């Protein structure tokens, strides 16, 4: 079961990825984690990646694809894997296809931008413990205070409105075109494509994913 999750930041992919991993026993492959692990392990690809990153440059698609191939050849990917955050662009999707990396399911999480902004900018974090609240959906007992310690809550830089809007613009420019790319792939019989309404309750989305994935 090889799965790609598509959707803007804040669309709920992370929450459902945890569920899919637990339910189907497949690992989530994050290219960021993979790069860090390869650099730490000092593999040939890791050394190449380190050299590029140390020079302040972006790692090439070719190198990332090579790392993905290396990663999915490991034992824990025998039953499949879950890709989140990759591919981000059509050239990356093409490179994956050229490298013979097949995908069984592509699942798009559809959520309107304004709801995503609402979801993200309302987050409040207790930095020391990692506890996360939301001013509307999961408020602390006392405004802007952690329930357990009473300490102040903060807003992460990534959760500030201007940052969120920039990330959404980037998503629509680069990643949203993958929706039609994978719809065409599904029409050609190369994968199965599903659109999930991410505006619903977590449990409802989870139930739909179980129906899709079996």
From Swiss-Prot:
UniProt keyword annotations, A-Z? ATP-binding, Cytoplasm, Kinase, Nucleotide biosynthesis, Nucleotide-binding, Transferase
Q: What is known of its domains?
A: Consists of three domains, a large central CORE domain and two small peripheral domains, NMPbind and LID, which undergo movements during catalysis. The LID domain closes over the site of phosphoryl transfer upon ATP binding. Assembling and dissambling the active center during each catalytic cycle provides an effective means to prevent ATP hydrolysis.
Superkingdom field: Bacteria
Question: Could you identify this protein by its name?
Answer: Adenylate kinase
Question: Which pathway does it operate in?
Answer: Purine metabolism; AMP biosynthesis via salvage pathway; AMP from ADP: step 1/1
What NCBIfam families is this protein classified in? adk, PRK00279.1-1, PRK00279.1-2, PRK00279.1-3, PRK14527.1
Subcellular location(s): the record lists: Cytoplasm
Which InterPro entries does this UniProt record tie to the protein?
Adenyl_kin_sub, Adenylat/UMP-CMP_kin, Adenylat_kinase_CS, Adenylate_kinase_lid-dom, P-loop_NTPase
Give the gene name: adk
């Amino acid at each position: 079961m090889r799965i790609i999750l598509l959707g803007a930041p804040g669309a709920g992919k992370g929450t459902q990825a945890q569920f899919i991993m637990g339910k189907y026993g497949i690992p989530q492959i994050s290219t960021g984690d993979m790069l860090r692990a390869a650099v730490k392990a000092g593999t040939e690809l890791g050394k190449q990646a380190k050299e590029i990153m140390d020079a302040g440059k972006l790692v090439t698609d070719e190198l990332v694809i090579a790392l993905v191939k290396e990663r999915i050849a490991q034992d824990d990917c025998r039953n499949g894997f879950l890709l989140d955050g990759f591919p981000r662009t059509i050239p990356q999707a093409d490179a994956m296809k050229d490298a013979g990396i097949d995908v069984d399911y592509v699942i798009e999480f559809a959520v309107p931008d304004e709801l995503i902004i609402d979801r993200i900018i309302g987050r409040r974090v207790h930095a020391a413990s990692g506890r996360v609240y939301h001013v509307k959906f999961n408020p602390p007992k006392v405004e802007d205070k952690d329930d357990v310690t009473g300490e102040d809550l903060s807003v992460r830089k990534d959760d500030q409105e201007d940052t969120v809007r920039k990330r959404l613009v980037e998503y629509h420019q680069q990643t949203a075109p993958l929706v039609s790319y994978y719809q065409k792939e599904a029409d050609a019989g190369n994968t199965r494509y599903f659109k999930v309404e991410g505006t619903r309750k977590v449990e409802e989305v989870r139930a739909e994913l179980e129906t899709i994935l079996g």
